[in-house]
Amino acid sequence: MFAAICLDEANENQPVYITLKLEPLDGDFLRQQYEDIIPGYYMNKVHWNSIKPDGEVPDELLMEMLDKSYALVLHSFSKKRQQEILLTTYCGLDCTNCEYKEPCKCNGCVATKGMPFHAEETPCPVAACVMQKGISFCGECTEFPCQLLTDYSNDTEHGDNPPGARIAACKMIKCLLEKK
């Protein structure tokens, strides 16, 4: 968990507070700047802070705090667990909101060992390459971004929207896994 949302049942379950993890010094500083940021409800008050979402805290700052909270919590896990959280595909494609996930019972090529719903008899070539090299995802490859991944990412019919999105995702995942 990197955030908790406290809801107001009397007010149609509108958020009363969003509780996020922050570095202790950042939390202290922000609590001094904004009265809508208080020590976290029901949490370790050193690291967790509750923010009134419709208060005086600027949306940009709230988004930045969400990102930092996610990174702090993610990096508290082992590298193996981080990969389990971040990687559902070998190529960086984000399958979490795929319209075929539920009807086709597909959890991405990592879970299906390279055989997602669209791979009928042979594994996806990108997944097969990653598995053959014994790496976790394309971003760990010494040839990244290779021609195979680039071709998949920029394919006009079945590629990314926008083109190159899975390459950018691999770069981001690689950065997240390297930070510690």
Segments from the language model and where they lie:
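Short, conserved beta-strand/beta-arch hydrophobic-aromatic motifs that form part
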Residues: 1-45, 56
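Cysteine-centered metal-binding/redox modules
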Residues: 83-180
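Well-ordered alpha/beta subsegment
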Residues: 42-85
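Active-site donor-binding loop signature of nucleotide-sugar glycosyltransferases
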Residues: 7, 53, 143
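Short coil/turn segments at secondary-structure boundaries
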Residues: 39, 53-60, 129-132, 137
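Short, conserved beta-strand segments within well-ordered enzyme catalytic domains
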Residues: 19-21, 50-52, 140
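Amphipathic alpha-helical interface surfaces
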Residues: 26, 30-33, 47, 61-65, ...
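Structured alpha/beta reader/binder surfaces that contact nucleic acids or chromatin modification marks
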Residues: 2, 28-32, 71-74, 116-117, ...
